Amino acid sequence: MQKQSDAVACIHEEITNKRNDYLHKVSTGIIKNHDFIGIEDLQVSNMLKNHNLAKAISEVSWSQFRKMLKYKAKWYGKQVVPVSKKFPSSQLCSSCGYRNKDVKTLVLRNWDCPTCGSQHDREMNASRNLEKKAIRLLTAGTAGLA
């Protein structure tokens, strides 16, 4: 029985090490290649209360990834800009600004803007909107840029 427990512990440690290595490589790459990083200010601890999402969220280590981005940004003199979780990043057309409230459901992965006709992948569209919002937050109060 002890051999099996040791084997399972070894597998868990290997998975943890691989995940940490991956998170370090990705976070370092992002920080080195970008002067600012806009991220959605998700409350991971609240999301873990949803039992349907908890395992998936904890397995990808979102909060750990975010911590890595923040401390590496300080090391490299870069900025991490949190964007409010209430900002409708997935719902806004990144081309014209139209708000599609039907995109609230996570089942809808792709959508076409009825105003300008742009085709959107939910995640790519959200990332473009988060970038624009982060730029606005960074430049707020700067004459002529906000």
Question: Which sequence ranges carry the predicted segments?
Answer:
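Positively charged, helix-rich recognition surfaces that bind polyanionic ligands
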Residues: 1-146
